[in-house]
Curated annotation (Swiss-Prot):
With S4 and S5 plays an important role in translational accuracy. The gene is rpsL. The lineage of its organism: Bacteria, Bacillati, Bacillota, Bacilli, Lactobacillales. Disulfide bonds: none annotated. One of its GO terms (cellular component) is small ribosomal subunit. Residues 9-19 have a biased composition (Basic residues). One of its GO terms (molecular function) is tRNA binding. Residues 1-22, 37-57 are annotated as: Disordered. This is Small ribosomal subunit protein uS12.
Length: 137
C-alpha cells in the first residue's frame, strides 16, 4: 500500500481497457505505409482460407471458419454463422467483432448477406442476423 507522500508525488494510474477486437482499430495508409488508429465497427477483407475446426472440451461439432486478410493488412480468423455458406477462397467478406466462446483465437464474425456472403436461406426467425430475406407469402 502506498504512503500519502507517494500518492501526492505520483497519484493513481487509471487502468486502460484492452480492446476485444483489436484488428478493427486500425486503418492502413498505403501511400505512407503506416497504420493509423481509427476504430471502425466493421472491416472488409478477402477470405484466404475456409475450413472447419472443432470446439473446446465439453462441446463437439465442426464449426465453420474463414481466415480473412483485412483491408488494413491484418489477418484474422472469423466465424461463419448459420447453416450452410457459399464462401470460398478469395471471397470478399465483411467482418464484425464478437468472439466464439468455444473456438480459441476466433474473435470476429462474418456478416451474412453482404458482399460475397449469401444469407441463410429458409431462415424464418432472427433473419436480420443471418442476412435472410423476408419470405414470399
Amino acid at each position: 500500500m502506498p504512503t500519502i507522500n507517494q500518492l501526492v508525488r505520483k497519484g493513481r494510474k487509471s487502468h486502460k481497457g484492452k480492446s476485444k477486437s483489436p484488428a478493427l482499430g486500425f486503418v492502413y495508409n498505403s501511400f505512407k505505409k503506416e497504420e493509423i488508429k481509427n476504430p471502425s465497427p466493421q472491416k472488409r477483407g478477402v477470405a484466404t482460407r475456409v475450413g472447419t475446426m472443432t470446439p473446446k472440451k465439453p462441446n463437439s461439432a465442426l464449426r465453420k471458419y474463414a481466415r480473412v486478410r483485412l483491408s488494413n493488412l491484418i489477418e484474422v480468423t472469423a466465424y461463419i454463422p448459420g447453416i450452410g455458406h457459399n464462401l470460398q477462397e478469395h471471397s470478399v467478406v465483411l467482418i464484425r467483432g464478437g468472439r466464439v466462446k468455444d473456438l480459441p483465437g476466433v474473435r470476429y464474425h462474418i456478416i451474412r448477406g453482404t458482399l460475397d456472403t449469401a444469407g441463410v436461406d429458409g431462415r424464418m426467425q432472427s433473419r436480420s442476423k443471418y442476412g435472410a430475406k423476408k419470405p414470399k407469402k
